[in-house]
Every structure is written in C-alpha cells, then in structure tokens.
Regions:
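Cytochrome P450 core scaffold surrounding the K-helix E-X-X-R motif
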Residues: 96-104, 131-143
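Reverse-transcribing Pol proteins
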Residues: 1-106, 151
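Active-site palm subdomain of RNA-directed nucleic acid polymerases
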Residues: 13-16, 64-66, 166-177
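Catalytic palm active-site di-aspartate
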Residues: 27, 91, 126-128, 161, ...
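Conserved catalytic palm subdomain of right-hand nucleotidyl-transferase polymerases, strongest
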Residues: 82-96, 112-133
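Hydrophobic (often cysteine-bearing) scaffold residues that line and stabilize catalytic clefts
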Residues: 47-51, 105, 124, 165-169, ...
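Electropositive, glycine- and tryptophan-enriched low-complexity nucleic-acid-binding patches
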Residues: 149-160
C-alpha cells in the first residue's frame, strides 16, 4: 500500500469519480408524477455553523451543485457512529415513490463473508464514500434538489437512500472486482 499511497484519496477534495466510459451517468427512471416541494426540517442553532461547513465541503468536493429546480426534498443531520461528526441525510421518500425500481437484488452478505472464514488474510475494497464515485445524469439531478442556507442545491452523485442506489452500486463493485 505504501508504494501506491498517491493512488489513495485521504481528503474529500482529492477523491475522484468512476470513469464515465466504464460507468455512464445514472438516469433516474420515474413514472408520471407531480413535482414535490417539501418544507425543510430546521437546522438546530447549535449545529448551524457545522452544517454549513459540511455543505460547503460537499460543494467543493463536487457532490452538490446549485439548482433552479422546482423540486424540494427534505434533509436533516444525524450524529455519526463516532458520536461527534455529523452526517447529512437526504429524505428521498417522494423520489422513491415515483422511481421505477431496479430489478437487481443485493447480495447475501452472510454467504459472501462465510467464504473468508478461517482465512489468514482477507482483501478489502474501500471506496471512500463510494456512492459519490458515480454521477447522476444532468437530466436526473433536479429530482434531488433540496433547500439549504446557500440556496437550492442538488446532488451530482448517486443518492444514498434512493431506491435503486444499492443494486446499482453493487453492480459497479462487481464490475470492478
């Protein structure tokens, strides 16, 4: 690993994305619907500055971009497992309700893990914030728009919590392996 250290991203600004010639941008398939505008959950005053810092960081990393869309989904923040850091969570319920579900079935992780039982050494593929490696098509990004203190923003990458994200990302990892 030390020989290839420069190939790893240790900061948000240095991480890349999957090559679009191997992983084309995702189109979100939807049934006919009416656009949605949901009122946002207020940011707690004590977390406001930290939430703004995280949003700016995601803009700089290319995960969020400005939007003029007529959609607005909710978002909120939760504590990560470390009990200190915050994670922004996008409530994609309205999008999931109109999405045509992917036919893929996620793998049985227990079966996969059992194959490594008793092994002296295992391998690990760590895709630093993996969903952020796969881009959404321009035509689908507006469906992910949400309101922030910096105006309307939309996701540029595969949304965590979207109905089809797990099977799509599973296919991506399978292709890589």
């Amino acid at each position: 690993m030390m020989l290839q250290n420069e190939g790893f991203a240790w900061e948000d600004q240095k991480r890349g994305q999957f090559r679009e010639d191997f992983f084309p941008p995702i189109d979100i398939p939807v049934v006919p619907y009416k656009p949605w505008v949901l009122k946002n959950i207020p940011i707690p005053p004590g977390l406001y500055l930290e939430v703004c810092r995280i949003i700016k960081q995601k803009i700089k990393a290319g995960v969020y971009e400005p939007s003029n869309s007529l959609y607005r989904s909710r978002w909120f923040c939760v504590l990560k497992k470390d009990g200190k850091s915050l994670r922004l969570v996008h409530s994609l319920k309205p999008l999931n309700e109109v999405t045509i579900a992917h036919s893929g079935v996620p793998p049985a992780t227990e079966t996969l893990a059992a194959q490594f039982a008793g092994q002296a050494c295992g391998r690990m593929l760590d895709l630093y914030v993996g969903y952020d490696k796969r881009t959404l098509s321009e035509s689908s990004r507006d469906l992910t728009t949400f309101q922030t203190p910096f105006g309307a923003l939309r996701l540029v990458t595969l949304p965590m919590g979207w109905t089809n994200s797990v099977p799509i990302f599973h296919n991506d990892v399978t292709f890589i392996l």
